[in-house]
Amino acid sequence: MSDKKLKITQVRSIIGGTKKQKATIQALGLGRPHYTVERKDNPCTRGQIRVVQHLVKVEEV
């Protein structure tokens, strides 16, 4: 599972989100809509994605 990477793109704004969601977006390295980052596919990253799943789009690379 560690060989794979995830391409995470923020598709919605964090305005109106909870503090936890804002902190998670920042921890993922995002901040504005259409920002994209690549992260290792591991349980920690998957958990962060689950918190903000309505704000991001995830693709396997």
Curated annotation (Swiss-Prot):
Keyword annotations of the record: Ribonucleoprotein, Ribosomal protein
Record InterPro entries: Ribo_uL30_ferredoxin-like_sf, Ribosomal_uL30_bac-type, Ribosomal_uL30_ferredoxin-like
GO MF term set: structural constituent of ribosome
Gene Ontology cellular-component annotations: cytosolic large ribosomal subunit
Keyword Ribosomal protein: yes
Biological processes annotated in GO: translation
Highest taxon above the source species: Bacteria
HAMAP family linked to this entry: Ribosomal_uL30_B
NCBIfam families, sorted: rpmD_bact
Subunit structure: Part of the 50S ribosomal subunit.
Entry similarity comment: Belongs to the universal ribosomal protein uL30 family.
Protein name in UniProt: Large ribosomal subunit protein uL30
Organism of this sequence: Chlorobium luteolum (strain DSM 273 / BCRC 81028 / 2530) (Pelodictyon luteolum)
